Amino acid sequence: MAQCGGGDVSRHRKGHLDTVESLCQGLLDDVMLDDDKCRAMFGYLQEWQDLASMCYGSLGGEPPLAPEASNGSGSSGGGGSFRKRRPDDAKGESNSICKRQRGKQQQQQQPCHPDQMAAAVGKGRPERARPGAKKKAEVASPKDSPATSASTVTAGQKTDYIHVRARRGQATDSHSLAERVRRERISERMRYLQELVPGCNKVTGKAGMLDEIINYVQSLQKQVEFLSMKIAASNPVVNFNIVEDLFGRQLSQAACNPAALPAMALPMAQVEPSCLQMSPLQQMQTSAGSSGYGLEMVVSNQYSPPGGPMSVPAGASVEPCLNVNGAAGWDIGSHGLFSGFDAPFQSVQSDCLLDNLKMEM
Amino acid sequence: MSSRRSSRGSISEEEINELISKLQSLLPNSRRRGSSQASTTKLLKETCNYIKSLHREVDDLSDRLSDLMATMDHNSPGAEIIRSILRS
């Protein structure tokens, strides 16, 4: 009877194995009277229990608690057997927990080691060493705490140390670790760039990717230059020198690298006649309101000279200004030219210059 | 076997170094740093930022261009010329 109770407990202990349970029940009903057979049965069941606990251990789940199993054993003798069996259960459970904890601690110690190395390596990287110190403090605690906190610590460590963890067979000296960290960072940036550059994810290999990135940056630079050129061209008179400047620069670029700029050569060739067209227009359209500041300045300079001889040096000094690279020439020229004018006009002019500069940049 | 692999590796390493210096020359603010080769990580980070800034610039410039086109008087001779430029 007592052994029967023990069998009952073990039956409830692995309640999810239904077929095994029914089999055990049938066997128990048969052999209940025979003590020896019962003992044999008990040993059999104990074996089964070990198997079940092994199953639990390998699955990583918590085995059902033993006190729940006592519900099924109604007999008084069952209580005794239960008490007799209880240490076994407790030992088995504690064994499995111990095993798991030992496993966790091994996992913790493995990342801990490279972390110490990284702390030794990265004196210039305190952001890496600081979480390491924090984790080391936490590593000490789970030795006497249940397995749940140990699992949370490992989860946190997994995210922290993925970069510096040394796998089996990898070197753990400081130089190798530093190199590994560096390579990790580089590949991370490369991945980021891959997202940024279209069509880069088709290319495999670092060299191809770098090639693609370089091409993309060059095309973007060209695009920016072309767009600013278009804007400069659509605001014709003021930015005439800048168009010329861009034009000259791109021509020199094209001369240096003729194959690289086939796309730029075409619009430039078509820009040229229009620019040339502009110069007669400049003289024709002096009265047009839609023309830019520069023309108005020249016009107003001619129409309302504060000092009589002003118009002649104006015409003379604007011409070289057009050829001067950048806005500095304009600035000097305008200050020299319009020193006799009122201040607001000059501020408009300088605003315009700033605008040009921005566009050119 | 190992020697062949190492020689191939060194070639690709050279290639990559070349490409990286080329990329460095493309970046605007890395030019002044000159010969002192910055770390690849920093270079790649700068490249990311530079590409982003170029994107922004392109967007800004196209916005301005469309604004200019919208505010332009359509039958003035200046607009004619601009349109002929833009069509190219």
Curated annotation (Swiss-Prot), chain A:
One annotated GO molecular function: protein dimerization activity
Use in biotechnology or industry: Plants expressing BCL2 in the lamina joint and the spikelet under the control of BUL1 promoter exhibit increased leaf angle and grain length.
Subcellular location: Nucleus
Compositionally biased tracts (Basic and acidic residues): 124-138
SUPFAM superfamilies reported in the protein's UniProt record: HLH, helix-loop-helix DNA-binding domain
Location of the region described as Helix-loop-helix motif in the Swiss-Prot/TrEMBL record: 184-220
UniProt cross-references to PROSITE patterns, sorted A to Z: BHLH
Domain spans labelled bHLH: 170-220
Pfam families to which the protein is assigned, alphabetical: HLH
Keyword Nucleus: yes
A GO-annotated cellular component: nucleus
Region feature Disordered, mapped onto this chain: 66-160
Protein keywords: Gibberellin signaling pathway, Nucleus, Transcription, Transcription regulation
Ranges for region Basic motif: 170-183
Bias (Polar residues): 146-157
Motif (Nuclear localization signal): 166-173
Family to which the UniProt record says this protein belongs: Belongs to the bHLH protein family.
Function field: Together with BCL1, positive regulator of cell elongation at least partially through increased gibberellic acid (GA) biosynthesis.
UniProt subunit comment: Homodimer. Interacts with IBH1.
PANTHER family reported for this sequence: BASIC HELIX-LOOP-HELIX PROTEIN 79 (PTHR12565:SF319), STEROL REGULATORY ELEMENT-BINDING PROTEIN (PTHR12565)
Name of the protein described by the UniProt record: Basic helix-loop-helix protein 79
Gene source species: Oryza sativa subsp. japonica (Rice)
Lineage: Eukaryota, Viridiplantae, Streptophyta, Embryophyta, Tracheophyta
UniProt gene name: BCL2
From Swiss-Prot, chain B:
UniProt-listed Pfam families: bHLH_ILI
Family from the record: Belongs to the bHLH protein family.
Organism: Oryza sativa subsp. japonica
Domain bHLH: 1-54
Induction: By brassinolide (BL). Accumulates in the dark.
Superkingdom, natural source: Eukaryota
Main location: nucleus
Signal peptide: none
4Fe-4S in keyword set: no
Tissue expr: Expressed in seedlings, lamina joints, nodes, roots, and floral organs including anthers, young panicles, pistil, lemma and palea. Expressed at low levels in leaves. Preferentially present in leaves lamina joints.
Any one of the GO BP annotations: regulation of DNA-templated transcription
UniProt-recorded Gene Ontology molecular function terms: identical protein binding; protein homodimerization activity
SMART domains from the UniProt entry: HLH
GO cellular component: cytoplasm; nucleus
Keyword Nucleus: yes
Record localization: Nucleus; Cytoplasm
Subunit: Homodimer. Interacts with APG. Component of a nuclear cell elongation controlling complex made of ILI5/BUL1, LO9-177 and BC1. Binds directly to LO9-177, and interacts with BC1 only in the presence of LO9-177.
Protein name listed in UniProt: Transcription factor ILI5
Function: Atypical and probable non DNA-binding bHLH transcription factor that acts as a positive regulator of grain size. Involved in the brassinosteroid (BR) signaling pathway. Binds the transcription repressor APG and forms a heterodimer of antagonistic basic helix-loop-helix transcription factors that regulates grain length and weight by controlling cell elongation in lemma and palea. Contributes, together with LO9-177 and BC1, to the promotion of leaf inclination and grain size by modulating cell elongation.
Phenotypic effect of disruption: Erected leaves with reduced lamina angles associated with lower cells length, reduced internode length and small spikelets and grains. Impaired response to brassinolide (BL).
Note: Plants over-expressing ILI5 produce increased grain size, caused by elongated cells in lemma.
Keywords, alphabetical: Brassinosteroid signaling pathway, Cytoplasm, Growth regulation, Nucleus, Transcription, Transcription regulation
